[in-house]
């Protein structure tokens, strides 16, 4: 099949949408999600026709969900042939969506979307692209808005589908399905038809096939147009709230690797609308998208604010939210197993513990030390007070500690609680000890019992380097 460069009204209309939302710029490299159905075939043809105008590089991704058997295989072959005819790079992904949905506890629709966008992002990285184009149209917006209303939604749900969302663009978002069908017919383009779209087994299909036609017939209105107009108006309201949310996010949230945290009191002080958006934004920073994160999840996270420390909830896609003292943390689930270690400290010498770090220890005369404040990872001890073998170890039941500046002893567990050290981090904190007597909780505090005083003559120096 060959696509002509003849100009139709469709192309001008899509071009207006592209310019209105600043979707495409010169020299963009665009990864297109092409199923072979009417919408994606139309988008492929339109963007191919605009290829020269913007000097675009186009790449096609097709995902076989392994749901429709032989029909799905023919869809892939159809799209591959299109790409061959048009001399466009073709990338095929296959995933057993029913199995994945069951494994991840998602609907097939959610699992399918997850796999598709993962494939788009993977291809984007592979080809050095900067945009992802998907073929949602005006009817999809209306259907999504109605579906969200039926499920219960906020402002974001009433917008339906954004024309531009990060690096994702939707060139057909202002085009009705009937316009797409006419365009394909006029250009003699024959899409693949997924007959499950015409079965009223699913809620979205019922909305498309029954609810919208019924409302339009009974109330004599263009429901698709009205809902799309409402969505466009609310998009501007949403943009304002998002800008406000970003401002607050930058003020009170702290990103640390694969986790993000916020002070509980700072979050509580925000308006409820901003609080919910902040939670969604925190999840987005960890996961890269918010698909699958529903209203109930957000409320569960906010309820954590009034729960005891170490309270935790699971979120979709192996993300968790937990309260750590006065912080709310959202992060990828940690899979670390409990560690146990115990090594005799070499004096003098270097003691290495895999996954924990290195300990350099040596003894000097007190006259050789001119500064006892070298930071949290270098400590000085009265060597004459140390009786017995010194080890570096992980915590054990019965460990006791006399923190510097305190009389008497306390359980190590109580010290960890006082210092607000998260429970899951405690096994990884190395302890310098003599038997059950802690000499130094590395990175935190040394023992009062082994401090250097006016009678000290020999000093044990221990330097810790984290691995």
From Swiss-Prot:
EC numbers on record: 6.3.4.19
Stored SMART domains: TilS_C
Pfam families for the chain: ATP_bind_3 (PF01171), TilS_C (PF11734)
InterPro entries according to UniProt: Lysidine-tRNA-synth_C, Phe-tRNA_synthase-like_B3/B4, Rossmann-like_a/b/a_fold, TilS/TtcA_N, tRNA_Ile_lys_synt, tRNA_Ile_lys_synt_N
Main localization category: cytoplasm
Catalytic activity: cytidine(34) in tRNA(Ile2) + L-lysine + ATP = lysidine(34) in tRNA(Ile2) + AMP + diphosphate + H(+)
PANTHER family, A to Z: TRNA(ILE)-LYSIDINE SYNTHASE-RELATED
Protein name: tRNA(Ile)-lysidine synthase
Species of the source: Caldanaerobacter subterraneus subsp. tengcongensis (strain DSM 15242 / JCM 11007 / NBRC 100824 / MB4)
Classification of source organism: Bacteria, Bacillati, Bacillota, Clostridia, Thermoanaerobacterales
